[in-house]
Amino acid sequence: MKLEHVAIDVADPEKLIAWGCENLGFRRSAPGSAFIIDDSGMMGLEIYRTGETSAAPDYAKMNAMTLHVAFVSEDVKADVDRLVAAGATLETLKVDNPAFHMAILRDPWGVPVQLCKREHTIFFK
């Protein structure tokens, strides 16, 4: 099996989709779609609101290690600066190990975003 997408229930899907497309390199799979696809075209997120009476999860109060969306970054520090300027909040920045640079941020709605630069990929070649 191959992973297709991860679904995230948020209070304001349209705003999160717009921010993700503008700042994280996503694009909608089709106009008006809840699916946004990364620049590889191989992985996507479904950003939606369930429409139920219960509130969307409060991602800002969750530990970022419980759920986060991770991205490969060629320059973690530069991407942190760019995302913070776009409204993200920095929680953790670790760039002292040359084999692994990492940052945890939260988008403007509290959803955790991880940036990673690894010496060796976690994927099979």
Predicted features and spans:
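Amphipathic alpha-helical segments
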Residues: D12-R28
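Short hydrophobic/aromatic beta-strand element in the GNAT-like acyltransferase core
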Residues: G44, A70, M102-I104
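Short amphipathic alpha-helices within nucleic acid-binding modules
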Residues: W19, K77-R82
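Vicinal oxygen chelate
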Residues: V80-K125
